[in-house]
């Protein structure tokens, strides 16, 4: 089996063909500009904000005296907390 035949056999699988149909061969009008691509990017940003916000809220303490300490705890003691905080920003 050649490489070309392997590629086509993968596209005939139900999951691969569905992804190909909805992501690659998506029917769109020809008069769309490149601004059309910013919709999915905004959606990805929204999902990242929601997911990181939920994880940050698990470690945050909304009290006047403890808020700064909880942010320091997130940055220093939580595994990957610095990454969560900067991804959320």
UniProtKB/Swiss-Prot annotation:
<dbReference type="GO" id="GO:0046872">
    <property type="term" value="F:metal ion binding"/>
</dbReference>
<keyword id="KW-0479">Metal-binding</keyword>
<comment type="similarity">
    <text>Belongs to the cytochrome b family.</text>
</comment>
<keyword id="KW-0408">Iron</keyword>
<keyword id="KW-0349">Heme</keyword>
<dbReference type="GO" id="GO:0005743">
    <property type="term" value="C:mitochondrial inner membrane"/>
</dbReference>
<keyword id="KW-1133">Transmembrane helix</keyword>
<dbReference type="InterPro" id="IPR027387">
    <property type="entry name" value="Cytb/b6-like_sf"/>
</dbReference>
<comment type="function">
    <text>Component of the ubiquinol-cytochrome c reductase complex (complex III or cytochrome b-c1 complex) that is part of the mitochondrial respiratory chain. The b-c1 complex mediates electron transfer from ubiquinol to cytochrome c. Contributes to the generation of a proton gradient across the mitochondrial membrane that is then used for ATP synthesis.</text>
</comment>
<dbReference type="Pfam" id="PF00033">
    <property type="entry name" value="Cytochrome_B"/>
</dbReference>
<comment type="subunit">
    <text>The main subunits of complex b-c1 are: cytochrome b, cytochrome c1 and the Rieske protein.</text>
</comment>
<keyword id="KW-0472">Membrane</keyword>
<keyword id="KW-0999">Mitochondrion inner membrane</keyword>
<dbReference type="GO" id="GO:0022904">
    <property type="term" value="P:respiratory electron transport chain"/>
</dbReference>
<keyword id="KW-0679">Respiratory chain</keyword>
<feature type="transmembrane region" description="Helical">
    <location>
        <begin position="82"/>
        <end position="89"/>
    </location>
</feature>
<dbReference type="GO" id="GO:0016491">
    <property type="term" value="F:oxidoreductase activity"/>
</dbReference>
<dbReference type="GO" id="GO:0009055">
    <property type="term" value="F:electron transfer activity"/>
</dbReference>
<dbReference type="InterPro" id="IPR005797">
    <property type="entry name" value="Cyt_b/b6_N"/>
</dbReference>
<keyword id="KW-0812">Transmembrane</keyword>
<dbReference type="InterPro" id="IPR016174">
    <property type="entry name" value="Di-haem_cyt_TM"/>
</dbReference>
<keyword id="KW-0813">Transport</keyword>
<feature type="transmembrane region" description="Helical">
    <location>
        <begin position="38"/>
        <end position="58"/>
    </location>
</feature>
<keyword id="KW-0496">Mitochondrion</keyword>
<feature type="binding site" description="axial binding residue">
    <location>
        <position position="88"/>
    </location>
    <ligand>
        <name>heme b</name>
    </ligand>
</feature>
<keyword id="KW-0249">Electron transport</keyword>
<protein>
    <recommendedName>
        <fullName>Cytochrome b</fullName>
    </recommendedName>
</protein>
